[in-house]
Amino acid sequence: EEVAKSGIYIASDVPAPRIYPIGLHALDTGSSVFVQSAQTSGEVEIVIHVGDKIHVGVGSDHTDRALETVSIPGSKQACVNHLAPTFWAWDDIADTWDDCIMRSWVDDRLYQEVGVSKFLSPPDILSILKERVNNLPDKNYMVYCGTYVSVDKALGYGNKWRYQLETPKLKRQIDAQYDVVDILNEVKSGFRVPLFNPQG
């Protein structure tokens, strides 16, 4: 609903959860995310890492919202997906998983807060991937698992993003943050190539 209000088309004819492949170049754990638009925003998501064992963590799917009105898959490649470098072993967290909470903040304002019980569990996500992805490897891949509406039900923009995964029962949390750097501002006004080609 919040993205639809911004003119972003959701492929409702494709069964949810919808899958958007991204390359490894679109993952980053650094302190800055570089963009070319003032209309970009993050959104907190559970991240699954499938290796010899399953681990869970948290990341921010930072997205160019202007480009997203034209192509959702393209917008996913235009900005990196930020990743917190800490993961928990699924076996250690599975029994208390439904009590975990995700949060994000933009410019120190609470942007999202949601319990992970609102989402499919990591095992359910991986089961769906096996049904819908061609040649899914047995291991060595990651999955960002989708997000939830912001607290004010509107897309937020800002310069500083922070996100968190907390397990209250185990008193553990994963935190990460990054600054947004609009590199288009390096080019003087009047010399910037438009984000979209002129129509007509």
Model-inferred region functions:
Residues 1-138, 142, 149-200:
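Catalytic-core "active-site belt" of small-molecule-metabolizing enzymes
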